[in-house]
Design a protein with these regions (language model features):
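A cross-family phosphate/adenosyl-ligand binding-site feature
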Residues: 1-121, 127-184
Length: 184
């Protein structure tokens, strides 16, 4: 693969599929990409920041108000430095925030500050939530603004049912990202 060493920001949200994002971060780091991770409070309930720090070999960003001795606002710097921003698992809540410009934590402020063409969103939720008209309207709005939507897939869900809404598998997410990460 001919690729430049591009900067990737992975924004991890609070869904059970957060554990799958560990594989995504590990694989991207193994491919020599610079991978930064930002996590919501909910994400930290599923996977600890130390896991992502170990996999990426970089500090994990968890707090909007913890700006490490830098005069640049952290959320602006993260948004500007990233060539690609992956939101995974993208919960219904975060999808709604992105669609409507709501920014009340580190991840949502980063996403609001980022150019839409940088964003790749991997939805993850229960089938009923995925099929909710509000979620579908938000997804349509994101697509109309040029955001890439990866999945979701159909299969076994944490609620012990089979349906559409589960986050795409890590290898599928990486394959969707690679065209944006290769030299043109």
């Amino acid at each position: 693969m001919t690729a430049t060493k591009k900067n990737i920001l992975v924004c991890v949200c609070g869904g059970i599929a957060a554990y799958k994002v560990c594989h995504v971060v590990s694989q991207l780091a193994q491919r020599q990409f610079n991978v930064d991770v930002a996590m919501t409070n909910g994400a930290q309930k599923f996977v600890g920041p130390l896991t992502f720090e170990t996999l990426s070999r970089r500090p994990v960003h968890t707090d909007l108000w913890n700006n490490p001795s830098d005069s640049d606002p952290q959320h602006i710097k993260l948004a500007q430095n990233a060539d690609v921003i992956l939101v995974a698992p993208a919960t219904a809540n975060m999808i709604g925030k992105i669609a409507h410009g709501l920014a009340d934590d580190l991840v949502s402020t980063v996403l609001l500050a980022a150019a839409p063409e940088k964003l790749m969103v991997a939805p993850s939720m229960n089938e009923q939530m995925w099929n909710n008209p509000a979620v579908q309207a938000n997804i349509a709005l994101l697509r109309s603004r040029g955001l890439a939507i990866i999945g979701p897939e159909s299969g076994w869900q944490a609620c012990r049912t089979v349906g559409t809404g589960r986050m795409s598998e890590p290898d599928s997410i990486i394959q969707a990202m690679l065209p944006r990460l290769t030299v043109q």
